[in-house]
From Swiss-Prot:
Catalyzed reactions per annotation: RNA(n) + a ribonucleoside 5'-triphosphate = RNA(n+1) + diphosphate
Family label: Belongs to the RNA polymerase alpha chain family.
Coiled coil: none
Protein name, UniProt field: DNA-directed RNA polymerase subunit alpha
């Protein structure tokens, strides 16, 4: 017998979020003895892992193909934008990974050479990664002569800056009604199942 029956009541895509309304029907009395709803909410908001840009390294190549590392306050004449705003845009990129990776760290690469504009689509991603961010334009350049390489370290972790879950509401009556909002890097149903795995209840779940 399944401890939990999950019924999807509503799901939709909002402007920059995914929304899900579900009912969790609890079939066994022992689940009533747990602070079940609050536990799930706490796990959803604090324990869900996700990938995010953690470190950015920028390398500038000169005409002799010698490269050196520059920082966000370096003045680069060929770049219209300042590098600080460029790095902020890179840090805010939202990624979706379609397969579970064994590692908690991977890399993406952006090559800037002979372009006047650089877009999100120019980023070379690891296999099975997709960029979800909407703002496509990253940086504008004054010259085709510049040669930059930008290395993005993607780190998988949990906490406010990483968590795909933006908001969780619940009402507990005989059953539990959950409203879950995510930033699209994971679906609400995916994170709900992950939360049940953490407390080892996914094997008792019927959808």
């Amino acid at each position: 017998m399944k401890l939990l029956n999950l019924k999807i009541m509503n799901k939709k895509r909002l402007k920059d979020q995914l929304y899900l309304l579900v009912i969790l029907e609890k079939n066994l009395i022992k689940l009533e003895l747990l602070s079940f709803s609050n536990l799930i909410r706490r796990i959803l908001l604090k324990e869900i892992y996700n990938f995010k840009v953690s470190t950015i390294s920028i390398f500038l190549f000169n005409s002799n193909k010698f490269c050196y590392k520059i920082h966000e306050f370096t003045k680069v004449e060929e770049v219209k934008n300042n590098l600080v705003s460029f790095l902020i845009l890179l840090k805010e990129i939202k990624f979706r990974s379609y397969y579970k990776l064994k590692t908690k760290r991977t890399f993406a690469l952006l090559k800037i050479k002979q372009f006047t504009q650089v877009f999100l689509t120019d980023i070379i991603l690891p296999n099975n990664f997709k960029i979800l961010s909407i703002d496509n334009n990253l940086i504008k350049l004054n010259s085709l002569d510049i040669n930059l390489k930008v290395l993005l370290e993607l780190h998988k972790s949990k906490g406010y800056n990483f968590n795909p879950v933006k908001k969780v509401n619940y009402i507990e009556e005989n059953n539990v009604y959950f409203e879950i909002y995510t930033n699209q890097t994971s679906t609400p149903l995916e994170v709900l199942v992950k939360s049940l795995k953490i407390i080892k209840l996914e094997t008792y779940l019927a959808i």
